[in-house]
A protein has these predicted regions:
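Core domains of carbohydrate- and sulfate-ester-processing enzymes
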Residues: 145-148
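Conserved catalytic core of nucleotide polymerization and phosphodiester-bond processing enzymes
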Residues: 1-143, 153-525
């Protein structure tokens, strides 16, 4: 078994990487123009490099270089990259993946991504559309004009079809702008004590670039088996609902309202903000899936309807968002598809996930898988792409709770962690006993625990609304773990005072306009 002692980490992991950014001897500033299938991704086999432009920067000066040719004809660039301490690029995962296709080992390359650097500086202020090279450059005082090549690329013209005399200055402009931004940005990050976060993002970027070359592989037998089971169950639920409702059109709001509130005598769920039933802009009662999930049953007939309706909706979502796509991939693509990790798309600083679009006959149009929150019950459908590899899952047990217990110095939470208390089971028990409309309709205790997990840490993230059972649970959580709740309250007070908050690990988040109301409630938190 390998241990960390058996692994020699690259020289740039840690302080040495930050020192290199600040006091480098040689770096490369890089930009590629490629053919444009799937936005020019290196993961698309039919894409090729059209043009590479780069600067070799040393204390003695800057050398401009470029080369027309594909990924198998970039020897001079590869030599410069290997001789440099790091590579600078904007949205560097793109360039890194093309370097990998050119034969370079990404584990040996330190990268500096000006897009990620700006994401770190901006905290939660910038969306992805605010992190383009043009917008970032303008924030540092470097204006830019629209190049004709850039205009054509935005209109979908492949760079391979753009005249060289137009494409070359466009590519050089991006390289030079990236260099100017890098010089300003790295100094600002150092001054603001954020450079360690930028390094972490950049190290992660190279790992993600490498990981995305590995496809996700579905087990064809298991996919077909579970698909048939879910379709059969869905059809049976539809039949039972038709009998129970007298065959009403479940898509008709008018018919559904009459059935729920006149025949079954449900009480309309109350909007906690307005203290009135949820209504449409026209004043009709809302019967969306989210609203109906808040219905509380008091009769056996109501119980029966909710059990059928909740399960039917869940199956419908699982089929449309996951299994239909999986079946298409198994039938038409040998069970193989590619996913991507998205950087700079979340307010929290985390990653999101999505899939590359795939044209499947089943849909008649390109479709992408839903990978951000893959249902737990479908994880076993994935298998290794190669026979000599394994697929495994690692998960930190109750990780959010452990971090909160440490940050809040909460003695109750810390003791429960030492004693191995199952906090998810407790959540399920509280919600079940208080007749939460979702949990109370699940007969199996293990499944109740699993479905309650998403609520266990709601109070950690400001959650306090929902069903009566959820509200009661959140209040109990805050009272039980006073060290955690007091720490979070102090953080909220700091944010109300300053308009921003710095986390213990250094990330800075901005909440302009945050105020404390007369009730003591702090807005924006």
């Amino acid at each position: 078994m390998y241990t960390m002692k058996d692994v020699e980490l690259p020289w740039f992991v840690g302080k040495a990487g930050m020192d290199a950014y600040l006091n480098f001897k040689q770096c490369v500033i890089l930009d590629y123009e490629t053919t444009n299938i799937n936005k020019g991704s290196a993961l698309e086999p039919d894409n090729e490099i059209v043009l590479a432009c780069w600067l070799v920067v040393t204390p003695e000066g800057v050398t401009q270089k470029h080369h027309w040719g594909n990924q198998y004809d970039q020897s001079e660039l590869e030599k410069d990259v290997k001789e440099s301490q790091f590579v600078v690029a904007h949205n560097a995962k793109f360039e890194l993946q093309w370097l990998k296709r050119s034969g370079l080992e990404l584990r040996d390359i330190l990268v500096y991504d000006t897009m990620l650097g700006e994401w770190v500086r901006g905290g939660n202020r910038f969306k992805l559309q605010h992190l383009s090279l043009e917008e970032v450059g303008q924030r540092y005082g470097y204006g830019s004009k629209e190049e004709i090549a850039g205009y054509l690329i935005k209109k979908g013209v492949c760079p391979s079809d753009i005249p060289r005399e137009w494409l070359l200055p466009y590519c050089y402009r991006d390289v030079e702008l990236s260099y100017l931004v890098f010089q300003e940005q790295v100094g600002a990050l150092h001054k603001e004590e954020l450079l360690h976060l930028a390094l972490t993002r950049n190290l992660c970027c190279a790992a993600l670039a490498d990981m995305e070359f590995n496809p996700s592989q579905l087990d064809a037998y298991e996919v077909k088996k579970v698909y048939d089971e879910y379709v059969a169950e869905f059809q049976e639920l539809e039949r039972q609902l038709a009998v129970l409702t007298g065959g009403i059109n479940m898509s008709s709001n008018k018919q559904l309202i009459e059935f729920l509130y006149e025949k079954l005598n449900f009480s309309p769920p109350i909007n906690p903000r307005t203290k009135e039933p949820f209504k449409t802009p026209k004043g009709d009662l809302q019967v969306t899936v989210d609203v109906l999930a808040k219905l509380e049953s008091h009769t056996s007939e109501q119980d029966k309807f909710l059990q059928l309706y909740v399960r039917r909706n869940k199956l419908s979502a699982l089929l449309s968002k996951n299994l239909e796509f999986f079946m298409g991939i198994v039938e038409e693509k040998g069970g193989e598809f590619f996913g991507r990790f998205n950087q700079a798309t979340t307010d929290t600083g985390g990653l999101s996930a999505s899939g590359f679009q795939v044209l499947l006959k089943r849909f008649g149009e390109p479709k992408a898988p839903q990978l951000q929150n893959l249902p737990r019950e479908f994880k076993y459908l994935f298998t290794a792409h190669d026979e000599d590899e394994l697929v495994f899952e690692w998960d930190g047990s109750q990780l959010e709770f452990r971090v909160a217990a440490d940050e809040g110095r909460d003695p109750v939470a810390q003791q429960e962690i030492r004693d191995g208390v199952d906090v998810h089971a407790f959540t399920a028990q509280v919600l079940y006993e208080n007749k939460d409309p979702e949990i109370s309709n699940i007969p199996d205790a293990g499944e109740r625990r699993q479905q309650s997990k998403k609520h266990t840490f709601r109070p950690l993230f400001g959650g306090g609304s929902g069903s009566k059972a959820l509200v009661a649970y959140c209040e109990y959580f805050k009272d039980k773990y006073q060290g955690i709740s007091t720490t979070q309250r102090n953080w909220a007070l700091t944010t109300a005072s300053k308009g921003w908050f710095r986390t213990p690990y250094g990330m800075k988040f901005y909440f302009p306009g945050t105020k404390m109301q007369a009730s003591g409630y702090i807005t924006n938190t």
